[in-house]
Amino acid sequence: MEKRVEKRRIVLVPVAAQGHVTPMMQLGKALQSKGFLITVAQRQFNQIGSSLQHFPGFDFVTIPESLPQSESKKLGPAEYLMNLNKTSEASFKECISQLSMQQGNDIACIIYDKLMYFCEAAAKEFKIPSVIFSTSSATIQVCYCVLSELSAEKFLIDMKDPEKQDKVLEGLHPLRYKDLPTSGFGPLEPLLEMCREVVNKRTASAVIINTASCLESLSLSWLQQELGIPVYPLGPLHITASSPGPSLLQEDMSCIEWLNKQKPRSVIYISLGTKAHMETKEMLEMAWGLLNSNQPFLWVIRPGSVAGFEWIELLPEEVIKMVTERGYIAKWAPQIEVLGHPAVGGFWSHCGWNSTLESIVEGVPMICRPLQGEQKLNAMYIESVWKIGIQLEGEVEREGVERAVKRLIIDEEGAAMRERALDLKEKLNASVRSGGSSYNALDELVKFLNTE
């Protein structure tokens, strides 16, 4: 009688946020398709927990809440993450202990989001291989390494020197010191300390990154040399895994019916992610700029994204009337389906990494309105490296909005960006096909996990 081969188990540990959960779950789907059992270890977070249940065949275990999420407002993002890591070690060890005792659970590996480095202690104690997963770009991972070696005092002094600001990091053209993502994490010193924790305290066996060689070959080569462990670029994971990933917000599918009535490449799609907030004036200027562009638009406005207002009631009635005649306003949209629709000609984005990849995969050029450090770096690559978008800088004014939309949708400049975006689309799709770089990287990762 043939001996039954037990499948090996992989434990995934995501950050409890849409931009981190989505690619982690896509990674899980890709590994599940290669024969691994998947367990997701998550903190107590009801909204995300209910969303993850849409993944049949995945097991879910809870890491007890060690630090209330409300503390992030008191501490700042970097300090909160460091405290979360300190307080989560013991509860995660207990979680892994229970999993290890279950019969038939041969844990091949713990794969954890780079910000959840508390997982290393449990991996080391139970002698389980661990792998880091970066949900952001390879270039951001490079920046973490660079920032981990800086002192806050010297960095602040250097940033007052224009010559130092514009200095290109060696071997990483066009990345400059002033492009390092230092905003959005609170005070500088806790951020640098967090980077040191993220980079220097790890004994992981490998790094997985949601990117592709055709997008970031220099950064990937730099990381491979600097880290001294295998680096696996598996992206874009939403096509590697053939899965859009979980949505934590209810999607308005009726917007697709509206898109079906629009002309090809005529619509500007606007979505600023799950966390962005706007001032009243900014929203009004956006509305007038979109109206004055005379282009149809699909505008995602999350409830509560404008302080003091539930949704769009802050707009004057005549503006709401014109907006709904010219465009479509949704509380949330099925983004991958929207970007792949032939009516969409451009994407106004906050330039989160998932949105950036999703736009490139569909060959859609972008208007970039980044809000914080990582997004600003992505926007720089979109505009200056890949040349598939334009940045909308400074205060949002209706004239600038109108001009940006026309440049992207109507002008020859936008047509050239679209051609470059379509070229990148083909390269990315080739990377996940048999023999492509991401396809091969996934096979190499599977071999690596089976030999660890």
Swiss-Prot record:
Binding site for UDP-alpha-D-glucose: 274, 333-335, 350-358, 372-375
Ubl conjugation recorded as keyword: no
Enzyme class of the recorded protein, top EC level: transferase
EC numbers on record: 2.4.1.-
Gene Ontology terms, MF aspect: UDP-glycosyltransferase activity
Pfam families hit by this protein: UDPGT
UniProt entry keywords in alphabetical sequence: Glycosyltransferase, Transferase
Family: Belongs to the UDP-glycosyltransferase family.
Protein name as annotated: UDP-glycosyltransferase 76E4
Taxonomic source organism: Arabidopsis thaliana
Protein encoded by which gene: UGT76E4
